[in-house]
């Protein structure tokens, strides 16, 4: 099906696709304009292998406007499982899970009718998004299983690695009552948002078995259904809905926003429920008919096609409203088209308080694709057309600070290649000079980071550059480089982002692509987090985050101009957030020293005290007063406040 044929298919303007139960009846609606017949098949269970499995009925649907097949069945069918059987003029018959299904049975082979009022945890109606000022935002990325699967986490065994592992707020290491873990730890770290790696239903974990495997989840199966392996009971579809919402509510009670990692750029395989519903419509193809694979791990969704765009926008809105999600991170955002991303931003903004919902993504793709109809990919070259509140991960910041992610031994500014200081200077002002071929409209568009789930952890990257094979040794040089790395991106304008555990030297022992496990490699090591040397590293992160919150100009979130760069020798960098170089009482001066020796740096006029010396950090000034000049510690970020 080419672009013109796709555009000739009828468009459905309603917002009620899927199964919608009320006390009077349950309406099923499916967009399948190329079908010649559709029936809905009802079941008592999510699979035929479960006790009580039986078919409850097969009902013929009728075609209406917009290519939609519909039927209304009596009663509220909450808890009933269903599929659609679709008949095509060429004789093909496809059985599919409803693309709009809100839940499913084990392994997602049947959808489930969900009345959201019957799948709400206690207090859900009182749940509210936390009010987090733009300058105070920072993101901490974690996988649901990684968060609490460690046997030392203090989370009870049946909740480890599950949505419910986020709900207790008093866990400690081995229940010692002293060393906080999980949410108890997170609520005092100083980050504002938790980004969850995919929590929708994905294909590569066997939900029917406790040991069904591990995967990051970038293999989407049912986009509007929570992943069953994260539920305490994957067989009853209401459980995953209720427990996912309970997780969100617990994070909200701790004052934390929730960002959802979404993968609307590709389907896991070419026979997805979407593609089997309207064959030839949902995925991009090359002129020879082969599906494009710009993600490198699946078949690209054609977001530029009208009903695909509608589906993506409505799916995002569903998670934002039904689960109170506070932000969305788009995997391989460059595979989405600009108009779709802008439509998502507009739709979120239309919600009460929706302008506070974060929206950002990866401005690259993993291979070639074939956008049609003049659509532009949502990459860094399209920032002129993207809404200013659609952000992007800055790989330039990532690589200049600590080295290129695709070359293990490649060094950056903090670990042996100080000449990258030219790029670090651009990072400070969120790359708003336009010197690197892209021009953000505002600082808040730029996600400033050095580590995420992909590639090496920060600690492992620093160890690789330093050729240190013992990842568990708290090497003093690596600790200094880690602190300096954090100190840089936490004083740059933009939105700071970190991988969970970066703040305690998280290691995967050199595994740079742990997407399918084992869990032992991926789970957070809460014992390591409380080893004295790594706990001190965490304290530094906590202090730098506190400084960032206390001094809003660091973020540039209110439209502040680029910082004033101080003239310093060699590869030293210094700046003051005030663009004219003045330093009134309470203002900051920031210095980076990438050298392994102490260096002298001149100070702006005035009297200064440290709030960070590269080892300790916090909002309370400490140590003596300084005027005129300051000796900077090796491999350090020093932050001073004017008296």
Q: How would you describe each model-predicted region?
A:
Residues 11-15, 494-511, 521-523, 527-588:
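Glycan-recognition and catalytic regions of carbohydrate-active enzymes
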Residues 1-23, 52-55, 64-168:
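The feature marks proteins involved in alpha-glucan
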Residues 145-323, 332-352, 358, 369:
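Substrate-binding/active-site clefts of carbohydrate-active enzymes
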């Amino acid at each position: 099906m080419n672009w013109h044929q796709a555009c000739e298919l009828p468009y459905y303007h309603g917002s009620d696709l899927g199964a919608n139960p009320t006390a009077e009846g349950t309406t099923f609606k499916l967009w399948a304009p190329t079908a010649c017949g559709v029936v809905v098949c009802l079941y008592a269970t999510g699979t035929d292998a479960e006790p009580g499995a039986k078919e409850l009925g097969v009902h013929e649907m009728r075609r209406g406007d917009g290519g939609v097949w519909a039927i209304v069945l009596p009663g509220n069918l909450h808890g009933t499982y269903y599929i659609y059987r679709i008949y095509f003029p060429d004789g093909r018959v496809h059985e599919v899970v409803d693309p709009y299904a809100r839940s499913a049975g084990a392994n997602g082979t049947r959808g489930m009718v969900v009345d959201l009022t019957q799948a709400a945890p206690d207090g859900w109606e009182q749940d509210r998004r936390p009010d987090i000022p733009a300058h105070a935002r920072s993101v901490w990325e974690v996988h649901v299983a990684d968060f609490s699967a460690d046997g030392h986490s203090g989370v009870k065994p049946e909740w480890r690695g599950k949505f419910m592992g986020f709900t207790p707020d008093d866990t400690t290491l081995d229940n010692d009552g002293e060393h906080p873990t999980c949410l108890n730890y997170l609520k005092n770290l100083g980050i504002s948002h938790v980004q969850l790696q995919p929590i929708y239903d994905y294909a590569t974990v066997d939900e029917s078995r406790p040991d069904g495997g591990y995967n990051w989840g970038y293999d989407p199966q049912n986009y509007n259904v929570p992943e069953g392996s994260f539920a305490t009971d994957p067989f009853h579809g209401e459980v995953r809905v209720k427990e996912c919402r309970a997780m969100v509510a617990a994070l909200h009670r701790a004052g934390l926003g929730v960002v959802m990692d979404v993968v609307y750029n590709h389907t896991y395989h070419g026979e997805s429920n979407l593609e089997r519903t309207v064959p030839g419509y949902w995925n991009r193809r090359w002129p020879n008919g082969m599906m494009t694979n710009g993600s490198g791990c699946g078949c690209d969704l054609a977001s530029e096609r009208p009903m695909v765009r509608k589906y993506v926008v409505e799916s995002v809105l569903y998670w934002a409203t039904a689960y109170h999600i506070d932000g969305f991170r788009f995997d391989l955002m460059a595979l989405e088209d600009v108009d779709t991303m802008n439509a998502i931003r507009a739709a979120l903004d239309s919600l009460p308080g929706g302008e506070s919902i974060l929206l950002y993504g990866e401005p690259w793709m993993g291979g070639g694709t074939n956008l049609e109809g003049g659509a532009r990919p949502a990459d860094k070259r399209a920032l002129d057309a993207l809404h200013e509140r659609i952000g992007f991960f800055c790989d330039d910041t990532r690589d200049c600070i600590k080295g290129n992610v695709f070359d293990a031994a490649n060094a950056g500014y903090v670990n042996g290649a100080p000449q990258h200081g030219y790029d670090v200077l651009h990072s400070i002002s969120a790359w708003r000079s336009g010197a690197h071929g892209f021009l953000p409209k505002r600082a808040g568009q730029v996600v400033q980071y050095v580590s995420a789930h992909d590639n090496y952890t920060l600690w492992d990257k620093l160890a690789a550059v330093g050729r240190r094979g013992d990842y568990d040794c708290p090497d003093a040089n690596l600790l200094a480089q880690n602190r300096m790395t954090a100190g840089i991106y936490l004083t740059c304008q933009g939105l700071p982002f970190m991988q969970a555990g970066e703040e305690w030297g998280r290691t995967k022992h050199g595994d740079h692509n742990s997407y399918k496990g084992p869990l032992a490699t991926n789970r957070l090591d809460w014992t390591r987090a409380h080893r004295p040397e790594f706990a001190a590293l965490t304290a530094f992160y906590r202090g730098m985050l506190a400084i960032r919150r206390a001094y809003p100009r660091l973020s540039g979130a209110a439209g502040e101009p680029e910082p004033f760069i101080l003239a310093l020798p060699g590869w030293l960098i210094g700046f003051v957030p005030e663009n004219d170089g003045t330093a009134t009482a309470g203002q900051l001066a920031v210095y980076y020293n990438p050298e392994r020796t102490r260096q002298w740096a001149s100070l702006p006029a005035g009297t200064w005290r440290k709030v960070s010396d590269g080892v300790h950090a916090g909002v309370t000034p400490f140590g003596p007063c300084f005027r005129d000049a300051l000796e900077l510690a090796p491999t350090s970020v020093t932050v001073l406040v004017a008296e």
